[in-house]
Amino acid sequence: MSGRQRTLFQTWGSSISRSSGTPGCSSGTERPQSPGSSKAPLPAAAEAQLESDDDVLLVAAYEAERQLCLENGGFCTSAGALWIYPTNCPVRDYQLHISRAALFCNTLVCLPTGLGKTFIAAVVMYNFYRWFPSGKVVFMAPTKPLVTQQIEACYQVMGIPQSHMAEMTGSTQASTRKEIWCSKRVLFLTPQVMVNDLSRGACPAAEIKCLVIDEAHKALGNYAYCQVVRELVKYTNHFRILALSATPGSDIKAVQQVITNLLIGQIELRSEDSPDILTYSHERKVEKLIVPLGEELAAIQKTYIQILESFARSLIQRNVLMRRDIPNLTKYQIILARDQFRKNPSPNIVGIQQGIIEGEFAICISLYHGYELLQQMGMRSLYFFLCGIMDGTKGMTRSKNELGRNEDFMKLYNHLECMFARTRSTSANGISAIQQGDKNKKFVYSHPKLKKLEEVVIEHFKSWNAENTTEKKRDETRVMIFSSFRDSVQEIAEMLSQHQPIIRVMTFVGHASGKSTKGFTQKEQLEVVKQFRDGGYNTLVSTCVGEEGLDIGEVDLIICFDSQKSPIRLVQRMGRTGRKRQGRIVIILSEGREERIYNQSQSNKRSIYKAISSNRQVLHFYQRSPRMVPDGINPKLHKMFITHGVYEPEKPSRNLQRKSSIFSYRDGMRQSSLKKDWFLSEEEFKLWNRLYRLRDSDEIKEITLPQVQFSSLQNEENKPAQESTTGIHQLSLSEWRLWQDHPLPTHQVDHSDRCRHFIGLMQMIEGMRHEEGECSYELEVESYLQMEDVTSTFIAPRNESNNLASDTFITHKKSSFIKNINQGSSSSVIESDEECAEIVKQTHIKPTKIVSLKKKVSKEIKKDQLKKENNHGIIDSVDNDRNSTVENIFQEDLPNDKRTSDTDEIAATCTINENVIKEPCVLLTECQFTNKSTSSLAGNVLDSGYNSFNDEKSVSSNLFLPFEEELYIVRTDDQFYNCHSLTKEVLANVERFLSYSPPPLSGLSDLEYEIAKGTALENLLFLPCAEHLRSDKCTCLLSHSAVNSQQNLELNSLKCINYPSEKSCLYDIPNDNISDEPSLCDCDVHKHNQNENLVPNNRVQIHRSPAQNLVGENNHDVDNSDLPVLSTDQDESLLLFEDVNTEFDDVSLSPLNSKSESLPVSDKTAISETPLVSQFLISDELLLDNNSELQDQITRDANSFKSRDQRGVQEEKVKNHEDIFDCSRDLFSVTFDLGFCSPDSDDEILEHTSDSNRPLDDLYGRYLEIKEISDANYVSNQALIPRDHSKNFTSGTVIIPSNEDMQNPNYVHLPLSAAKNEELLSPGYSQFSLPVQKKVMSTPLSKSNTLNSFSKIRKEILKTPDSSKEKVNLQRFKEALNSTFDYSEFSLEKSKSSGPMYLHKSCHSVEDGQLLTSNESEDDEIFRRKVKRAKGNVLNSPEDQKNSEVDSPLHAVKKRRFPINRSELSSSDESENFPKPCSQLEDFKVCNGNARRGIKVPKRQSHLKHVARKFLDDEAELSEEDAEYVSSDENDESENEQDSSLLDFLNDETQLSQAINDSEMRAIYMKSLRSPMMNNKYKMIHKTHKNINIFSQIPEQDETYLEDSFCVDEEESCKGQSSEEEVCVDFNLITDDCFANSKKYKTRRAVMLKEMMEQNCAHSKKKLSRIILPDDSSEEENNVNDKRESNIAVNPSTVKKNKQQDHCLNSVPSGSSAQSKVRSTPRVNPLAKQSKQTSLNLKDTISEVSDFKPQNHNEVQSTTPPFTTVDSQKDCRKFPVPQKDGSALEDSSTSGASCSKSRPHLAGTHTSLRLPQEGKGTCILVGGHEITSGLEVISSLRAIHGLQVEVCPLNGCDYIVSNRMVVERRSQSEMLNSVNKNKFIEQIQHLQSMFERICVIVEKDREKTGDTSRMFRRTKSYDSLLTTLIGAGIRILFSSCQEETADLLKELSLVEQRKNVGIHVPTVVNSNKSEALQFYLSIPNISYITALNMCHQFSSVKRMANSSLQEISMYAQVTHQKAEEIYRYIHYVFDIQMLPNDLNQDRLKSDI
């Protein structure tokens, strides 16, 4: 190439980044510079001059390029003077002629394969590449291999720089493709990628100048080629199209369709007979062989025809099938007849007859398909097809039954089965059976064509070998055989495989098409082609997959086993040969029909060529093909020899990166862009550089993995030996095995679960490698096999005995564990094994290195076999984990003198178990040590990787039992002694500890390292002794009944809490054997307990995971002993916990000054199961330090609250119960939360389980009291009054120890954040998201019953974030309880007959009004106990209103049945969202009634006089749980009941969630008539006039409306206002209540008139209520208390505006409130706190906003100065206007200061909001799935309407047109299909949770070409669905086509734009904000546009998390209520154990 030409490249290619591949350099004409020349230094001045010249040239190039874009469409006149044709390839005249023609007109080039279509394409592409420097050239091919081939051709033919070319396929990421479109000029891609990029707007359509389409004959119908052209035309007509194909089409119509779709202006056609190509084409001999049917095949054919007649005759008799000869009918004709019958059914055929005819059609179609197989492929293919029908794999049940009744068919089928049954099984084995070539078994030729094919192939190889004597030549020949069906491909391959090694055959098929068929993956296909091309195989049997698109090399013989009707298929097959040498084509046809098909195909081919070449009038060409070259310019031909470099295929990025590091010095300059040493230290880097770094001298250019072995590609023995290629190093998978049996050190990224599993396998392999004979591991495990545990449905293979995550462990049989338990206990609570299996599935136990340990103790096992018989059933929990179980037995059975053997190995066992044991049904591995244990056993380790170096490193104490599981360390009597000295040390250290704050995060790593070196164990950790576990003792078993609830997942699979990052070990060893026999405890120990004043461990398994569903194993008959305690100060842990009492075995290793991840208390199930005692909170002083660590948690002993004064008494084992509790004082600045356990407040408390068959007063003389947590969980040290505890229990009940455990030294694990501590935490602390164990503090210990305690779980089920379907959860709870009580004959249903039960309210354990103090809390406030009020309660359910599941005196714990209905907060003009769980859509699916109303049943009428106090108690307790996260309109059930009319209340459709008898129902009704607010007088509704509006059509939506059925629970509301007037509903947005209440829609005018009226009358109706709130609880209570109880002094004139704003906000859909059930309340600063109160309690003042066109309303002025009005054009959702802040709290002590601070804070937020600009273009977001189904909609919006359309992952949404509106597009056929109805409804409900407005566009189905138009028939299902949608508030629009849909979308978006709610934020998120966007999208019920708003409006996630409700509402452009949801979610403090395992580990590691 000339220098001038290179300059053109450099000039016009400057828009590309000019790196190594500039156009000039890459053209191949320049010589590369020598390395020396590049090193020559230039003078500084000259260098600067060169740089400045380059800059000037670059600017000039860009300027010229910009000018060119404006002139002549970007055509370069200087370059356009010539068009270049390469001479480096032989010049062929036909190619030159076609290339010239294609430059100036859209051309279809038809050339036989192998004659240079690719060359012509390269020439045309190169010239357009030159002519249009700023344009794009696009090549499209249907398959990836063709795309890749064309890139290489363009480079090798024309020298187009590789740096300017790019390949894009579906595997390329969309974001990457967008960058490629901008940076590259010549693009090679598949058509679907092009369609996607055009739809996404990534492709610059206007810049495309040349479009080349390969395999153009595919451009039929709506193929992607056609879509691309249609889309491009919408943007520009100025582009050239070049279409390439070997054949134009199968017939004239197809050719015309291709011409029309691709805008073809001319055809360049060359056939094999054309004179100008004869000289260039090799001779291809086509032989047609006609094979007659044999006698056997003819006989079977005759029988088969008789079967066909019997089935087709009935269709012919009914006149639905044409009368023709049965043998001449075809499958296609029957299909056409069936379609005709469906379109025009006969009037005589109705009802069931129509179904019968359809079935007969289906049978006939199947039989005729078999007939064609028989004729073409033979008997075997027919048999395989019939087998699929008869064995049911094809799912044709009716056909199977009908054929089975036909005698002739069964005879034929049995005959075929005898012939081919063996081959059927062989074929099922897949392709691998081919290579075996079993010559012993005779091959059955199912068709005569097979013999002919065999003859042809053998003859070919014989003749070839005769002609080519050399071995190399013999291997060069290739044979390819084509067949249409896989079965015949398999048959041919099996036949030819008998002729090995002459014939090396392989099959080649496509991907798997179904479950039963196994195809080739793409990798396998490429591997087969590669081996075929390289000589691994010489014969390839292929389906149509091999016809086109793959470079299979030169083939000498092509055999077509069947004929193809389409000439295209035949031409493609024939094109595989004759490319480089003479080829031969053999077509084997059966006599008769197949021969006729072939002849017809050849005739069609000839007619097409004749029509195109001779009579051009037949085809209509595109007449407006652009010339592309400006007028006056006629490019002249310039032949040029183009040289090019070596084509380098594109490598994966990782290879390029590695090469760059290997060859970094190649050009003499080091690549400084790479970091020198990465993460290596200087010494490590030197070591790596010296030993491991690959250099050029190593001559290693590539590192490869071992050859992939495919199961389907065998025959490896014949594979030629791989020549060792120099410079290629193959990695080995085995050379590093010596390092793979233990985890190596890690940095930042820990080992994965998969890695640890692999390590465990390697350990076991290594251990078993040296064994001979029997496996020791198997022998060890075998002795523990319980045959009762083995079910017939599952027997685990031996090699899976370690698979603890087995999903198949499900048994319904009573296990040995249950049997053994029942033998030694009077009563038990056992979960079913099936429930256990649910947990086993969730656990992931990693293999442990215990083999060596087991060997050492195997002898002891045998010796202690008898002892073990009695107890191992308890320890061997029902599971399939042999490791942990065996380990426990080993340790138990060891004699005391042998337990200390080999400390290091035992430690090693624990080491491997670190972070490993997660099996809920297994006792964990327990290790024991003597006093001689080294200090290393208590040390902390920096990284878990080092822990595994058992031989080199010391073992850390955090490996000993660091589990969330209960750890049963059973001890013997001889191991017991007291440790009084520890008591003093503990108490002294505790006080010292409390003087510190937790260390900062930055200092923890150093501290941890020091602790790891210096901390020592000072005491012993003893192992259980089996001798003292006797079955005659009673076992204290705890029930874990919440098995099936969704809460089992909350603390995900018993996650180990002691991670490598948490450096201290915190143990909890429950001891539950302290009671008498009826309480399932050991009797002897119980006597000792009484002497010691010790009580049963009440929080036995506090930290047990909720997934645990087996009974709690306990320590039995054990005495206490010394416990290892870490004693350290700063560098060491403080000794804070004491274990003196003889019955408790606690290990307290809690270095509280280091990072300590304790075992947190599971508040969801464990607490529900076993009432907690002595849980406490550390006071706020400990939380105020800014350096408080996120994971710091406090592990407290249950005795640890004893004061320093108690020390001496403690040492003497005080006998007095009262002293133990009375002596507690402010040692820990901790106050015990003493509260009511009233039935109303047991939403928040955990009730103690006691004997249900006895009066509950009969307990020990110990009374405990716990203040209810109405504040932020401050806890006071209280005098704990003793109460009695009954020693005698009745057998058959479940007893769970209670208050005695208050003294149990088994400490309770609580996170530092403690239970529900949100509201009063420090501002600095509020930013932490610590795991919170909720309801831990509310633990009444007195007077409850078993059922209440267990039914607590039902409440918990409904409170978890996961529970969105309460009904299901209730059922699960019921099942869980019933299964729990199965073996104790005590179930929920049986409870009513369980004898007299006295249900004592536990809320009166303290006198009302008692003052409780928090000595060292933040403000030393005085708590005033709430006193009884005579004032009535507005709620209907003041008592313990539990809807019992049965008519039982035992009422389950009260729980809201439905998510909180914040109907006060309904949005401005939406009520689409369903506020009730059972919305009308759900009713439409599953139920008949409307949404259930939560009517609560009073438990007892005797407490009616206390309703007001009860309501306050209930609300106070609610505040602790939901706090600020719920709005003030809390009680949706009572709200709807109280103010609605009688008719509304007596809604017949109301469904109660539980059964209630008539008397109870009447009680509910009578109670509802009275108002507690008016001293139980009757409630009166004073109605005013009704505003009845009559509409002639559906009114348009109002911007502001009042939600239907919403009744304000405010005394301040106007009593004269009727409930009908309160509800203003847009008919298009009606909720499910509307139909029941018959509410009427009000126009904007009516609403405004009503507002004016109410403002005039509001003053007289005003009534204020005032209560005294406790200071500490005021912050929470005012956020949740109903306004009638609070003292909100609202100006009467503002009431209506408050109400209006209530409805200007959205209501929560049913599923979205589940998360709010268990919210905690972190303390926030006063500004945020006050703003939250304002947002929750007082609604903003907003004016009306117009709907479809702007209307100016008068601004409603408020009479109160602080009020602000907003212009009517501004959306209410964006402007939460503050009202009088002080009105939220009448108490001047809190309201005054916060009011003054809050107002400016809110004002600042208003000013910071950026209003959208009116002039900005309208934007619509489109879901990615719409690219395929709604392409024309997208293109019309973008190209025709000029809207900004962005394709985004919208999470199932179709179109988002504004911040609040989503549009779903559905076709009529989808709406008609009742199968999809439920799915569609679920989709709508999903959208309702995210958007305020929903619109559904019902689009008419597109008519396919040639289809007759059918009239649309409405169905009942269709109409009912539309009705339901309208009733649910969904707007329905109808469209006739996609273009009209685009018009509707445009109108909707413009309407939303006018209302100022359009999309105005950038839709593209840069890389640094993409993670924030993903985080926002992870928030439940957050739409993509909301996340996008938050991403752009908030500078960071931290900024959003610290924002107030108003800010979130404004910036996220959401309603106030949606902002509440977001706020609650962000501030919800949850237990990290709820995270999945990997996330939990990653989170903990990331916090290091």
Curated annotation (Swiss-Prot):
Q: Where is this region: Disordered?
A: 1-45, 1433-1476, 1518-1540, 1668-1809
Could you give a GO molecular-function term held by this entry? ATP hydrolysis activity
Report where it is expressed, by tissue.
Expressed in germ cells of fetal and adult ovaries. In fetal ovaries, it is present in oogonia but expression is stronger in pachytene stage oocytes. Expressed in oocytes arrested at the diplotene stage of prophase I during the last trimester of pregnancy and in adults. Expressed in the testis.
UniProt GO cellular component terms: chromatin; cytosol; FANCM-MHF complex; Fanconi anaemia nuclear complex; nucleoplasm
Superkingdom of the source species: Eukaryota
Q: Which InterPro entries match?
A: DEAD/DEAH_box_helicase_dom, ERCC4_domain, FANCM-MHF-bd, FANCM/Mph1-like_ID, FANCM_DEXDc, Helicase_ATP-bd, Helicase_C-like, P-loop_NTPase
Checking Gene3D superfamilies in the record gives: 3.40.50.10130, 5' to 3' exonuclease, C-terminal subdomain (1.10.150.20), hef helicase domain (1.20.1320.20), P-loop containing nucleotide triphosphate hydrolases (3.40.50.300)
Instruction: Give start-end positions of Acidic residues composition bias.
Output: 1518-1538
Q: What keywords appear on the UniProt entry?
A: ATP-binding, Disease variant, DNA damage, DNA repair, DNA-binding, Helicase, Hydrolase, Nucleotide-binding, Nucleus, Phosphoprotein, Premature ovarian failure
Function noted in UniProt: DNA-dependent ATPase component of the Fanconi anemia (FA) core complex. Required for the normal activation of the FA pathway, leading to monoubiquitination of the FANCI-FANCD2 complex in response to DNA damage, cellular resistance to DNA cross-linking drugs, and prevention of chromosomal breakage. In complex with CENPS and CENPX, binds double-stranded DNA (dsDNA), fork-structured DNA (fsDNA) and Holliday junction substrates. Its ATP-dependent DNA branch migration activity can process branched DNA structures such as a movable replication fork.
Record note on quaternary structure: Component of the Fanconi anemia (FA) core complex, which consists of CENPS, CENPX, FANCA, FANCB, FANCC, FANCE, FANCF, FANCG, FANCL, FANCM, FAAP24 and FAAP100. The FA core complex associates with Bloom syndrome (BLM) complex, which consists of at least BLM, DNA topoisomerase 3-alpha/TOP3A, RMI1/BLAP75, RPA1/RPA70 and RPA2/RPA32. This supercomplex between FA and BLM complexes has been called BRAFT. Forms a discrete complex with CENPS and CENPX, called FANCM-MHF; this interaction stimulates DNA binding and replication fork remodeling by FANCM and stabilizes the binding partners.
| Name of the protein described by the UniProt record | Fanconi anemia group M protein
